[in-house]
Amino acid sequence: MADEAGTRSAGGRPIPAAEPLRPALSRQRSQGAVHLRVAPAGTAADAPTRIVDLAESGPLRLRCPRQGAERMLEGVLVNTGGGIACGDVFTVSVTVEPGGACVLTTTAAEKIYRSDGPCAEIVNRASVGAGGRLDWLPQETILFDRARLVRRFEADLAPDASLLVAEIAVLGRAARGESLEQALFEDRWRIRRDGRLVYADSLRLDGAVTALMNRRAIGGGARALATILDLSLRAEGRLDEARALLDALPAQVEAGASAWNGHLAVRMLAPTVAPLRDAAARFLAAWRGQPMPRVWQT
């Protein structure tokens, strides 16, 4: 028997109507972005570079610890969220106007957390005008087990612009004895000079990444890898200098350099991140002829 209050039980007590099903909670995705434009503060050859435009959104921020008379502006990217989770999308774009000079780094290692399916995405874009220079020197990226990361670096350079890029990837948290039993790391670089593609590089590690890196023909047991790329007018002619610097690195770091098509590339592999990070910092400081950004030393 029923009335407007709802269905009644056999004892005559009303049975409350069932509440509608609530939709399953969806995981909150984070979208962060920094869009930066810098230019010289004057026409002198040694005029310091200053920020012209800056837009920030989500957890990404930019800080400039040094705003002195130095020609090169130093910027530090900060992820206030502390890491990158599945489905997050982080975008950084930087424009260096003609004659400007800028070095960008990160405040700490970037952590890529385990994923329940979707990939995290990092998109970095750069444009460097005539006579400009950009040094892209983030600290290492650490992938947790079951992390899924797709990263892209794209740059457009004027005919006489300079670009130096260094990226370090760490496959698992060695301090915890972690291996990547299941993960995805896809890294895609595309560099154009005067509109023409001059450098293209793609890496894809998918599945049992640690097992893949244990293969002699792939990683020889390495858990940390670095790529350093110099696209400047003198880079190709400095190959012997680069190899001499690499020969002085510790034995546990395997490294090689090659130069062609107006640029120079360095690869490094190591069983753990500490010696590789130190080796990359030593090489870059000598190569650039100036110290690494201060956050690298903390």
Curated annotation (Swiss-Prot):
**What is the first-listed, main subcellular location in coarse terms?**
cytoplasm
Family annotation (Pfam families): UreD
Show the GO MF annotations: nickel cation binding
- Self-association or partners: how does it assemble? UreD, UreF and UreG form a complex that acts as a GTP-hydrolysis-dependent molecular chaperone, activating the urease apoprotein by helping to assemble the nickel containing metallocenter of UreC. The UreE protein probably delivers the nickel.
Subcellular location field: Cytoplasm
Tell whether GTP-binding is among the UniProt keywords.
Answer: no
Q: Does the entry feature the keyword Chaperone, yes or no?
A: yes
| Keywords on record | Chaperone, Cytoplasm, Nickel insertion
- Give the span(s) annotated as Disordered: 1-30
Please state the span of the N-terminal signal peptide per the UniProt entry.
none
| Protein name as annotated | Urease accessory protein UreD 3
Tell me the function of this protein.
Required for maturation of urease via the functional incorporation of the urease nickel metallocenter.
- Tell me which family the UniProt entry assigns to this protein: Belongs to the UreD family.
Q: Which organism is it from?
A: Methylorubrum extorquens (strain PA1)
Classification from the root reads: Bacteria, Pseudomonadati, Pseudomonadota, Alphaproteobacteria, Hyphomicrobiales
